[in-house]
Amino acid sequence: MARYIGPKLKLSRREGTDLGLKSGVKPYDVKTKKSARPPGQHGVSRNKSSEYSLQLREKQKVKRIYGVLERQFANYYKEAARKRGATGENLLAMLESRLDNVVYRMGFGSTRAEARQLVSHRTVMVKKAGRDEFVRVNIPSIQLQDGDVIAIQEKSREQLRIKNAIELATQRGIPEWLDVDHSKLQGTFKKAPDRIDLPAEINESLIVELYSK
């Protein structure tokens, strides 16, 4: 399955919620005021959604939020199921611990897609906990561990898009499981988030039910 490159707002309309795919400069409800219905020729279906369709839709929504493709998402689920604790919560914690997501959460990218691009272009450096030196990386899916430090490389620090992203992040707020110093353009991954720290609009139990069949 190829990565979707079409209109981002269309995906949010399809899921009926803001997936965080746009920068957030203009509120989601304003952007969709004239197009509140799901995209497509026929708009809203009158048929009641089946249990399976609800489960599948929730999986699609989470995949789109984090920009993860089908096979990769399935691998995340398998790993989450092997860990101790609630599988659904483990899954979300792993997705939130991805490098591209953390770059976004820290405010260095206005969207996860932009954060992913920053990583792919080797703009981001990571210093593993207990190490002394930063290493430039280009793999967005790197799983961060407690104490890992992220920084923007020196020559990229004046990029306008990074400055704009930081301004948006100050309005959005930084999660408590991260420690960020925007003046130094770096931050620390303190720990993986707990469920209370994660998006409330996600119903991970539907995804667990889907994969448990």
Curated annotation (Swiss-Prot):
One of its GO terms (cellular component) is small ribosomal subunit. One of the primary rRNA binding proteins, it binds directly to 16S rRNA where it nucleates assembly of the body of the 30S subunit. With S5 and S12 plays an important role in translational accuracy. This is Small ribosomal subunit protein uS4. Part of the 30S ribosomal subunit. Contacts protein S5. The interaction surface between S4 and S5 is involved in control of translational fidelity. Residues 97-163 form the S4 RNA-binding domain. The keyword Glycoprotein does not apply. Residues 44-53 have a biased composition (Polar residues). Keywords: Ribonucleoprotein, Ribosomal protein, RNA-binding, rRNA-binding. SUPFAM superfamilies: Alpha-L RNA-binding motif. Belongs to the universal ribosomal protein uS4 family. Residues 16-53 are annotated as: Disordered. GO terms for biological process: ribosomal small subunit biogenesis; translation. InterPro entries: Ribosomal_uS4, Ribosomal_uS4_bac-type, Ribosomal_uS4_CS, Ribosomal_uS4_N, S4_RNA-bd, S4_RNA-bd_sf. It comes from the Bacteria. Pfam families: Ribosomal_S4 (PF00163), S4 (PF01479). One of its GO terms (molecular function) is rRNA binding.
